[in-house]
């Protein structure tokens, strides 16, 4: 019984989240109108999600740079030592 109850609760939560997402997206009716084009839609950079995206992008680029610095140094050092 508990498995069915847990599955039913997960289904209700999923349906609730779907309902919230659909009606939250439906409030932005100007986005779906025929006058709105992707190249004219205004990007908002002061929302939480855009700030979070920029922070994640910065961290990703920093980690990529650190990895490349380590990898290039490791390759350079092994190639240099190989000649001796």
From Swiss-Prot:
Signal peptide range equals 1-26
Where is it chiefly localized? Answer: virion
Tell me the compartments it is located in.
Virion membrane; Host membrane; Host Golgi apparatus, Host trans-Golgi network
Q: What is the membrane topology listed in the Swiss-Prot or TrEMBL record?
A: Single-pass type I membrane protein
So where does this one cross the membrane?
46-66
Provide Intravirion-side residue ranges.
67-84
Q: Which domain of life is it from?
A: Viruses
Which stretches are Virion surface in the membrane topology?
Answer: 27-45
Q: What is this protein called?
A: Envelope glycoprotein N
Organism from which the protein derives: Human herpesvirus 6B (strain Z29)
């Amino acid at each position: 019984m508990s498995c069915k109850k847990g599955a039913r609760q997960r289904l209700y939560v999923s349906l609730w989240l779907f309902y919230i997402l659909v009606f939250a997206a439906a409030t932005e009716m100007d986005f779906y109108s025929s006058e709105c084009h992707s190249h004219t839609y205004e990007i908002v950079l002061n929302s939480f999600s855009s700030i979070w995206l920029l922070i994640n992008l910065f961290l990703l680029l920093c980690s990529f740079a650190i990895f490349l610095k380590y990898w290039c140094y490791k390759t350079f050092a092994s190639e240099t030592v190989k000649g001796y």
